[in-house]
Amino acid sequence: MAKEDCIEMEGVVLEALPNTMFRVELENGRIVTAHISGKMRKNYIRILTGDKVVVEITPYDLTKGRIKFRSK
């Protein structure tokens, strides 16, 4: 999958799920399940409920995504 195919959206973390998965509410009101990207996992970046994040979603499955960035 090429990077150009991904959709980037901002959202807020609603809850933390097992295995570093998170439920994120996007700015358009949709709720997706997202996991942490590899660089965030490698650098031990902590994500808590209420954090603003940038989520990368594929157009093929709009219910799953990858957390790419955590805002301060």
Swiss-Prot record:
Organism superkingdom: Bacteria
Domain annotation S1-like: ranges: 1-72
GO cellular component, one term: cytosol
PROSITE patterns named in the record: S1_IF1_TYPE (PS50832)
Record SUPFAM superfamilies: Nucleic acid-binding proteins
CDD domains: S1_IF1
Main location class: cytoplasm
GO terms of molecular function: ribosome binding; rRNA binding; translation initiation factor activity
SMART domains with a match to the protein in the record: S1
InterPro entries recorded: NA-bd_OB-fold, RNA-binding_domain_S1_IF1, S1_domain, TIF_IF1
Entry keyword set: Cytoplasm, Initiation factor, Protein biosynthesis, RNA-binding, rRNA-binding
Subcellular location field: Cytoplasm
Signal sequence residues: none
Pfam families associated with the record: eIF-1a
DNA damage keyword on record: no
Keyword Cytoplasm part of the UniProt annotation: yes
Described purpose of this protein according to its UniProt entry: One of the essential components for the initiation of protein synthesis. Stabilizes the binding of IF-2 and IF-3 on the 30S subunit to which N-formylmethionyl-tRNA(fMet) subsequently binds. Helps modulate mRNA selection, yielding the 30S pre-initiation complex (PIC). Upon addition of the 50S ribosomal subunit IF-1, IF-2 and IF-3 are released leaving the mature 70S translation initiation complex.
Protein family membership: Belongs to the IF-1 family.
SUBUNIT field: Component of the 30S ribosomal translation pre-initiation complex which assembles on the 30S ribosome in the order IF-2 and IF-3, IF-1 and N-formylmethionyl-tRNA(fMet); mRNA recruitment can occur at any time during PIC assembly.
Protein name per UniProt: Translation initiation factor IF-1
Organism ancestry: Bacteria, Pseudomonadati, Pseudomonadota, Gammaproteobacteria, Thiotrichales
Gene name tied to this protein: infA
